[in-house]
Amino acid sequence: MLSTILRNNFVRRSFSSRIFSQNEYETAADSTLERLSDYFDQIADSFPVSEQFDVSHAMGVLTVNVSKSVGTYVINKQSPNKQIWLSSPMSGPKRYDLEEEGKWTYAHDGEQLDSLLNREFRKILADDRIDFSRHV
């Protein structure tokens, strides 16, 4: 029983067999945060959003204040762990690891960052045209 739990846990958490250098991680994380920041700005220009909708990106931290009723998303680099951390007012905190193909994946359930953002922002804005897949 214990070996099955440990084996399943190991399988679930081992998405990438490649170890990224610190420089590769920093480049990927910075690029991801920049693309996300640009897309959130595009969302503000292209979709009906709250007057409180605000995007700020500085020093490895992207903050998106959606509205008073929804709350604030914070997406940031966690360089010591080579991760991107997300704090979502809808789904809570998550830690994403970089996969070989350049996608950020949450080890606990295998969901990728773009998939979670698609689901949550499509619900928030009631619009299926939201698509983070090219921006993460």
Swiss-Prot record:
<keyword id="KW-0406">Ion transport</keyword>
<keyword id="KW-0809">Transit peptide</keyword>
<dbReference type="GO" id="GO:0000303">
    <property type="term" value="P:response to superoxide"/>
</dbReference>
<dbReference type="GO" id="GO:0006879">
    <property type="term" value="P:intracellular iron ion homeostasis"/>
</dbReference>
<keyword id="KW-0350">Heme biosynthesis</keyword>
<comment type="subunit">
    <text>Monomer. Oligomer.</text>
</comment>
<dbReference type="GO" id="GO:0008198">
    <property type="term" value="F:ferrous iron binding"/>
</dbReference>
<comment type="similarity">
    <text>Belongs to the frataxin family.</text>
</comment>
<dbReference type="GO" id="GO:0008199">
    <property type="term" value="F:ferric iron binding"/>
</dbReference>
<dbReference type="GO" id="GO:0008340">
    <property type="term" value="P:determination of adult lifespan"/>
</dbReference>
<dbReference type="GO" id="GO:0051537">
    <property type="term" value="F:2 iron, 2 sulfur cluster binding"/>
</dbReference>
<dbReference type="InterPro" id="IPR017789">
    <property type="entry name" value="Frataxin"/>
</dbReference>
<protein>
    <recommendedName>
        <fullName>Frataxin, mitochondrial</fullName>
        <ecNumber>1.16.3.1</ecNumber>
    </recommendedName>
</protein>
<keyword id="KW-0813">Transport</keyword>
<dbReference type="GO" id="GO:0042542">
    <property type="term" value="P:response to hydrogen peroxide"/>
</dbReference>
<dbReference type="GO" id="GO:0034986">
    <property type="term" value="F:iron chaperone activity"/>
</dbReference>
<keyword id="KW-0560">Oxidoreductase</keyword>
<dbReference type="InterPro" id="IPR036524">
    <property type="entry name" value="Frataxin/CyaY_sf"/>
</dbReference>
<keyword id="KW-0496">Mitochondrion</keyword>
<dbReference type="GO" id="GO:0006826">
    <property type="term" value="P:iron ion transport"/>
</dbReference>
<dbReference type="Pfam" id="PF01491">
    <property type="entry name" value="Frataxin_Cyay"/>
</dbReference>
<keyword id="KW-0409">Iron storage</keyword>
<dbReference type="GO" id="GO:0016226">
    <property type="term" value="P:iron-sulfur cluster assembly"/>
</dbReference>
<keyword id="KW-0410">Iron transport</keyword>
<dbReference type="InterPro" id="IPR020895">
    <property type="entry name" value="Frataxin_CS"/>
</dbReference>
<dbReference type="GO" id="GO:0004322">
    <property type="term" value="F:ferroxidase activity"/>
</dbReference>
<dbReference type="GO" id="GO:0005739">
    <property type="term" value="C:mitochondrion"/>
</dbReference>
<keyword id="KW-0408">Iron</keyword>
<dbReference type="InterPro" id="IPR002908">
    <property type="entry name" value="Frataxin/CyaY"/>
</dbReference>
<dbReference type="GO" id="GO:0006783">
    <property type="term" value="P:heme biosynthetic process"/>
</dbReference>
<comment type="function">
    <text>Promotes the biosynthesis of heme as well as the assembly and repair of iron-sulfur clusters by delivering Fe(2+) to proteins involved in these pathways. May play a role in the protection against iron-catalyzed oxidative stress through its ability to catalyze the oxidation of Fe(2+) to Fe(3+). May be able to store large amounts of the metal in the form of a ferrihydrite mineral by oligomerization.</text>
</comment>
